[in-house]
């Protein structure tokens, strides 16, 4: 089975939208008279999101409705700018802004957006703030089950899984943007995640007669979680900097990069015995290992008894009881995930 999907959604604000393409493939082949069965799945996704500056909504409420958003038409502004009107309008990217005299030390920027007015031009906010995110994801799995020829009570099972995703977000504020006027800003970040898993086990079923059932299972599980984060945002020196040779150049900045991974490995076993389809005995044991703790390995046993009372003769004919089963169990559990548990807490750190 194959499926493909496409979404194209226009945003509420200008220059915002969402596009997504998805594809999925599912195969269920079987071989050797259904002794070997497979379930293969693959899903892929690509999405592009363009974000608009949400502050434009509030700015639109505050904006003077009589003011031309693309020009300075009042006598007040003509007198304020004088001969610098055309240059200021060009600096603002052709948009009106409430302004004040600049102290940038740059003769080509005599005026700058007056942030104390708290009334930026909403159209300029939407035009000069660009933020786009790209997301890619792939999820794949393969389940393979084999019923051994000549020993059909024995099954071998293998599961493989992969979950890979990558997100990249870029932001660019023009020098004409009221939130980064004159200086502008540019930057972005990307995150790559990769989770891999393997699960394999053997399971043996045996019905000795109508009253006795026994099954046992043993297996191995492996998981790897990996994540890489990169980000970099660039600022610039102002024209008023003490060293004029630095004016307009990038400030020193160190790109942020962080990688982390962890492993989870398990050996497990389980045995079930059922007597007369009424009395159940279950025992399990796991030997789990995680890279998140200094003591990597721990045992987790459990045992349970159950009585399916509905199968007893004195309850079978009571119609208002559809099922009744009593269970008593004991076990130990562990936790290697949590808000205060990260991959490297147990490793000492040193500062030089």
Where do the protein language model's features map onto the residues?
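Flexible, solvent-exposed loop segments that connect beta-strands
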Residues: 178-182
């Amino acid at each position: 089975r194959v499926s493909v999907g496409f979404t194209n959604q226009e945003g509420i604000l200008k220059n915002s939208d969402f596009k997504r393409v998805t594809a999925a493939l599912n195969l269920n082949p079987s071989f050797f008279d259904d002794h070997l069965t497979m379930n293969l799945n693959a899903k892929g996704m690509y999405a592009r999101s363009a974000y608009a500056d949400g502050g434009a909504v509030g700015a639109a409420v505050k904006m003077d409705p009589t003011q031309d958003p693309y020009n300075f038409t009042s006598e007040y502004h003509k007198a304020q700018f004088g001969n610098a009107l055309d240059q200021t309008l060009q600096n603002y990217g052709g948009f009106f802004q409430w302004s004040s005299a600049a102290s940038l030390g740059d003769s080509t920027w005599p005026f700058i957006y007056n942030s104390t007015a708290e009334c930026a031009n909403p159209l300029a906010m939407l035009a000069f703030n660009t933020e786009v995110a790209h997301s890619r994801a792939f999820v794949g799995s393969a389940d393979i089950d084999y019923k051994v020829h000549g020993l059909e009570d024995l099954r071998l099972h293998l599961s493989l899984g992969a979950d890979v995703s990558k997100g990249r977000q870029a932001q660019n504020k023009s020098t004409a943007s009221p939130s980064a006027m004159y200086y502008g800003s540019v930057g972005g970040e990307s995150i790559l995640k990769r989770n891999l898993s393997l699960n394999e086990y053997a399971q043996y079923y045996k019905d000795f007669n109508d009253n006795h059932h026994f099954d046992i299972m043993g297996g191995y599980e492996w998981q790897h979680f990996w994540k890489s984060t990169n980000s970099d945002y660039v600022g610039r020196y102002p024209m008023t900097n003490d060293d004029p040779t630095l004016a307009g150049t990038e400030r020193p900045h160190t790109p942020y990069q962080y990688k982390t991974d962890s492993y989870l490995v398990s050996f497990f076993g389980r045995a079930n015995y059922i007597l007369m389809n009424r009395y159940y005995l279950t025992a399990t044991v796991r030997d789990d290992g995680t890279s998140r703790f200094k003591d990597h390995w721990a045992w987790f046993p459990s045992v349970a008894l159950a009585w399916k009372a509905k199968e007893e003769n004195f309850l079978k004919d009571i119609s208002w009881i559809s099922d009744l089963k009593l269970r008593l169990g004991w076990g130990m559990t562990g936790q290697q995930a949590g808000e205060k548990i990260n991959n490297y807490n147990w490793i000492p750190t040193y500062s030089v």
